[in-house]
């Protein structure tokens, strides 16, 4: 039982690692919280620091979700891995290492899915990028993909999967509430795929 509690803490701490902040400060000498949207996630990193930093942060945020979700398998615990994934996402959104001001749960949630259901992860990746290249709204693509994740979990019939996806989708949509207003008002920034970035 003690091991279980410790691993939940480890999962939260993994999620709390603010890779956007680390990359910004070490690689570029800036605090990304003071630039762009101020969000500690991949999208703000792409827009503020460029493609190289953006890809680095996004991949790192995905992998911390994957690693956290795999903890019970690594240590042979008979506990559903999605609970550890949820702990990592909570850490990503409310990181203890960055004054509880983190990202919007998208990349780390993707990492959780990558570990738990690679097939669903692949389907959602197609949905996300199709929406992104069609609408050019990262936020809208993220929210719609989160809803599709809930639908996929319902189809699976896995009760814990359904609960986890509902919680993650709720978190993603809640963290994008300001984006929803900007989309309605047509002031939400669009992804610019032709713009030259670092």
From Swiss-Prot:
Subcellular location(s) of the protein: Cell membrane
Catalysed reactions, semicolon-separated: an acyl phosphate + sn-glycerol 3-phosphate = a 1-acyl-sn-glycero-3-phosphate + phosphate
UniProt topology in membrane: Multi-pass membrane protein
Lineage: superkingdom: Bacteria
Pathway it works in: Lipid metabolism; phospholipid metabolism
GO BP field: phospholipid biosynthetic process
Alphabetical keyword list: Cell membrane, Lipid biosynthesis, Lipid metabolism, Membrane, Phospholipid biosynthesis, Phospholipid metabolism, Transferase, Transmembrane, Transmembrane helix
GO cellular component: plasma membrane
GO MF, one example: acyl-phosphate glycerol-3-phosphate acyltransferase activity
A Pfam family it matches: G3P_acyltransf
Segments traversing the membrane: 4-24, 71-91, 113-133, 147-167
EC number(s) given by UniProt: 2.3.1.275
InterPro entries with a match to the protein in the record: G3P_acylTferase_PlsY (IPR003811)
Protein family (similarity comment): Belongs to the PlsY family.
Function: Catalyzes the transfer of an acyl group from acyl-phosphate (acyl-PO(4)) to glycerol-3-phosphate (G3P) to form lysophosphatidic acid (LPA). This enzyme utilizes acyl-phosphate as fatty acyl donor, but not acyl-CoA or acyl-ACP.
Oligomeric and partner information: Probably interacts with PlsX.
Protein name: Glycerol-3-phosphate acyltransferase 2
């Amino acid at each position: 039982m003690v091991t279980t509690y410790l691993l939940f803490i480890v999962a939260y701490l993994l999620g709390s690692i603010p890779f956007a902040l680390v990359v910004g400060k070490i690689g570029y000498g800036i605090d990304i919280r003071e630039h762009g949207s101020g969000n500690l996630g991949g999208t703000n990193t792409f827009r503020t620091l460029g493609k190289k930093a953006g890809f680095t942060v996004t991949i790192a945020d995905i992998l911390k979700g994957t690693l956290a979700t795999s903890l019970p398998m690594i240590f042979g615990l008979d506990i559903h891995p999605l609970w550890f994934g949820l702990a990592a996402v909570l850490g990503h959104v409310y990181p203890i290492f960055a004054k509880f001001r983190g990202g919007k749960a998208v990349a780390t949630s993707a990492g959780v899915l990558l570990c738990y259901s690679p097939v669903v992860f692949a389907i959602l990746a197609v949905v996300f990028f199709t929406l992104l290249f069609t609408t050019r709204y990262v936020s809208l693509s993220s929210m719609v993909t989160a809803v599709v994740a809930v639908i996929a979990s319902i189809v699976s019939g896995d009760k814990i999967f359904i609960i986890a996806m509902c919680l993650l989708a709720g978190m993603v949509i809640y963290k994008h509430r300001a984006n929803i207003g900007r989309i309605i008002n047509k002031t939400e920034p669009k992804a610019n795929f032709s713009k030259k970035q670092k």
